Amino acid sequence: MRNPNIFLALYVTGSWIWRQRMPMAQCLKSCVCSDYEPLVKDAVQLPVVDEGRVTAAVNVVKLFLPDCLSVDDVLKSRDELKKLAQARNISKILAKSATAIHIARGIKCPKGTENVLRQTLVDNCTVFKSMYSVLAYLYLSPGADTDGMIDQVVAQTADRTIMLGDMTVLSHAMRVDGVDIPHSSQDLAKMGLSAADSDTLDPIQLVGVMEPPSPPPHTADAREDAPHVSPPERRPQSSATLTSLDAKSRRGLAGQVPAS
């Protein structure tokens, strides 16, 4: 005779498997093929093209390229677009040079290094003028061949160009909280502004970069070699002359007083 408990156990187990068939299938699916699930087409949204922005961009390009009437014309004008990109790079260099010159007007540097900075600023002004000329040439000469010209100008002036970052670092090194601070010769040597064995007196005196150079001091030898000029003799004036001068000065002061 068969044991009825076996049939009861099989019935309960089969019922539980039947009730858990969907969760088990999803579990197997997530473990085996989760990386290969197909995308739901309804959830994919294509980017919406803003025609207003496209039209505005075309209108901006038309300011520089009057012959372009559509986006296709702009894409075909690769040479003109290259020229515009070059002009944009030159404009960035011009902006940095102008800002560096403007910042240099208010900063101070250790005495003895102002000549180097002044010469650098002069070279920077030369770069500014050269780049401005090239930029004007690009805008005023449509269809001109500019290959190599800009690279040549940049190569000739790159080693002499002082940029905004250099001026900002220098200005920050010379000032703390808006107050000029003195530097020792060792500090200047660490910043690469002077040699460590230079005969520089401490503390370093700060001078303006844009200030005109002071005239050289007169030495004792120069004063000895200079011809001696005696001061003019002062002749004694009579009392009548002094009285007349005193009266004239009083009348002059009376004429300068505004009438009430």
Swiss-Prot record:
It comes from the Viruses. The keyword Secreted does not apply. Keywords: Host cytoplasm, Host Golgi apparatus, Phosphoprotein, Virion, Virion tegument. GO terms for cellular component: host cell Golgi apparatus; viral tegument. Residues 220-236 have a biased composition (Basic and acidic residues). Its main location: virion. Residues 208-260 are annotated as: Disordered. It is found in: Virion tegument; Host cytoplasm; Host Golgi apparatus. Phosphorylated. The keyword Phosphoprotein applies. Disulfide bonds: none annotated. Residues 237-246 have a biased composition (Polar residues). Oligomerizes. Interacts with UL7; this interaction mediates UL7 incorporation to virions. Plays several roles during the time course of infection, including egress of virus particles from the perinuclear space and secondary envelopment of cytoplasmic capsids that bud into specific trans-Golgi network (TGN)-derived membranes. Belongs to the herpesviridae UL51 family. This is Tegument protein UL51. The lineage of its organism: Viruses, Duplodnaviria, Heunggongvirae, Peploviricota, Herviviricetes.
